[in-house]
């Protein structure tokens, strides 16, 4: 849905779908939640409380899922890339960077601007490495290792 086929004349992200999903639907969901929390706090405390919102780091879509199962054990990203003809890891990572940047830009645009002056944006991009050592930072396609969580935790501690 978000991704055109690699052999298509319009390969890469489907801009109109990405805009509709991130810039409209997901943004609207964040506005709804932030507005509700803000109004509840104003009603009960007389003022909004500080809120931290955060995006994601750049994942490595290598097909590693969550060991131990669960409802959604993964892999989450690699199968979609494979079905759409993206076999090269470099191209997959480039597409993930564009998508994650778009999501983070949307969040950053909400934080600190009316009516969300009390909302701070935490940028987690480039916290976890995606180079040859990425498996020491990423447990799977979406979740950090303990070492990765320590790096993320330091960023949260700094903003709180």
Model-derived segments and spans:
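Acidic carboxylate-rich catalytic motifs and surrounding loops in phosphoryl-/glycosyl-chemistry enzymes
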Residues: 117-134
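Substrate-gating cap/lid alpha-helix
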Residues: 62-120
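Oxyanion-hole/transition-state-stabilizing segment in secreted/luminal serine hydrolases
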Residues: 1-22, 57-66
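Hydrophobic, aromatic-enriched interface-forming segments
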Residues: 24-78
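Well-ordered, non-membrane alpha-helical segments in soluble/globular domains
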Residues: 12-38, 93-107
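Short glycine/proline-rich turn/loop motifs
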Residues: 86-88, 132-137
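Histidine-centered active-site loop/cap adjacent to the catalytic His
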Residues: 136-160
